[in-house]
Amino acid sequence: MAALLLRHVGRHCLRAHLSPQLCIRNAVPLGTTAKEEMERFWSKNTTLNRPLSPHISIYGWSLPMAMSICHRGTGIALSAGVSLFGLSALLVPGSFESHLEFVKSLCLGPALIHTAKFALVFPLMYHTWNGIRHLMWDLGKGLTISQLHQSGVAVLVLTVLSSVGLAAM
């Protein structure tokens, strides 16, 4: 707003063929620069031994907080995984069948295959169940602290059970 007013006054002065100094007679130079102010701020915080604000150490970790962070992380990981899989399908030579035959020729044990399938399906199931939980919140259901913890535990149990079930297929 101030910049627009200053621009308007400046244009008015130019139109009137006056110098800007005549139009802005009460201009006061700044006492300090932003750099000096930042240096003073950081030196004060250093001498008082203050942590960065807001610092992660001031927060008490809770189940809903950790699950929110994990929900965002799984969303990013799943998006990146799908994008990379699509790009690799376009850029890597050969067909899907040839890559599948290559994996079969490695003779991996069933335990390793089951573990890999579980590791792939776990983030998907967690993001799905926690997404349903978020949709319930959008409906106004389960917003008390005790219900947040109960639904969090339910999401974790459902995630493990559905991941084990899908990995066993």
Curated annotation (Swiss-Prot):
<dbReference type="GO" id="GO:0006121">
    <property type="term" value="P:mitochondrial electron transport, succinate to ubiquinone"/>
</dbReference>
<dbReference type="InterPro" id="IPR034804">
    <property type="entry name" value="SQR/QFR_C/D"/>
</dbReference>
<keyword id="KW-0349">Heme</keyword>
<keyword id="KW-0809">Transit peptide</keyword>
<keyword id="KW-0816">Tricarboxylic acid cycle</keyword>
<keyword id="KW-0813">Transport</keyword>
<keyword id="KW-0496">Mitochondrion</keyword>
<dbReference type="GO" id="GO:0046872">
    <property type="term" value="F:metal ion binding"/>
</dbReference>
<keyword id="KW-0249">Electron transport</keyword>
<feature type="binding site" description="axial binding residue">
    <location>
        <position position="127"/>
    </location>
    <ligand>
        <name>heme b</name>
    </ligand>
</feature>
<dbReference type="InterPro" id="IPR014314">
    <property type="entry name" value="Succ_DH_cytb556"/>
</dbReference>
<dbReference type="Pfam" id="PF01127">
    <property type="entry name" value="Sdh_cyt"/>
</dbReference>
<comment type="function">
    <text>Membrane-anchoring subunit of succinate dehydrogenase (SDH) that is involved in complex II of the mitochondrial electron transport chain and is responsible for transferring electrons from succinate to ubiquinone (coenzyme Q). SDH also oxidizes malate to the non-canonical enol form of oxaloacetate, enol-oxaloacetate. Enol-oxaloacetate, which is a potent inhibitor of the succinate dehydrogenase activity, is further isomerized into keto-oxaloacetate.</text>
</comment>
<keyword id="KW-0472">Membrane</keyword>
<comment type="subunit">
    <text>Component of complex II composed of four subunits: the flavoprotein (FP) SDHA, iron-sulfur protein (IP) SDHB, and a cytochrome b560 composed of SDHC and SDHD.</text>
</comment>
<dbReference type="GO" id="GO:0006099">
    <property type="term" value="P:tricarboxylic acid cycle"/>
</dbReference>
<dbReference type="GO" id="GO:0005743">
    <property type="term" value="C:mitochondrial inner membrane"/>
</dbReference>
<feature type="topological domain" description="Mitochondrial intermembrane">
    <location>
        <begin position="167"/>
        <end position="169"/>
    </location>
</feature>
<feature type="topological domain" description="Mitochondrial matrix">
    <location>
        <begin position="138"/>
        <end position="144"/>
    </location>
</feature>
<keyword id="KW-0812">Transmembrane</keyword>
<feature type="transmembrane region" description="Helical">
    <location>
        <begin position="113"/>
        <end position="137"/>
    </location>
</feature>
<feature type="topological domain" description="Mitochondrial matrix">
    <location>
        <begin position="30"/>
        <end position="62"/>
    </location>
</feature>
<feature type="transit peptide" description="Mitochondrion">
    <location>
        <begin position="1"/>
        <end position="29"/>
    </location>
</feature>
<feature type="topological domain" description="Mitochondrial intermembrane">
    <location>
        <begin position="93"/>
        <end position="112"/>
    </location>
</feature>
<comment type="pathway">
    <text>Carbohydrate metabolism; tricarboxylic acid cycle.</text>
</comment>
<keyword id="KW-0408">Iron</keyword>
<keyword id="KW-0999">Mitochondrion inner membrane</keyword>
<comment type="similarity">
    <text>Belongs to the cytochrome b560 family.</text>
</comment>
<feature type="transmembrane region" description="Helical">
    <location>
        <begin position="63"/>
        <end position="92"/>
    </location>
</feature>
<keyword id="KW-0479">Metal-binding</keyword>
<dbReference type="GO" id="GO:0045273">
    <property type="term" value="C:respiratory chain complex II (succinate dehydrogenase)"/>
</dbReference>
<feature type="transmembrane region" description="Helical">
    <location>
        <begin position="145"/>
        <end position="166"/>
    </location>
</feature>
<dbReference type="InterPro" id="IPR018495">
    <property type="entry name" value="Succ_DH_cyt_bsu_CS"/>
</dbReference>
<dbReference type="InterPro" id="IPR000701">
    <property type="entry name" value="SuccDH_FuR_B_TM-su"/>
</dbReference>
<dbReference type="GO" id="GO:0020037">
    <property type="term" value="F:heme binding"/>
</dbReference>
<keyword id="KW-1133">Transmembrane helix</keyword>
<protein>
    <recommendedName>
        <fullName>Succinate dehydrogenase cytochrome b560 subunit, mitochondrial</fullName>
    </recommendedName>
</protein>
<dbReference type="GO" id="GO:0009055">
    <property type="term" value="F:electron transfer activity"/>
</dbReference>
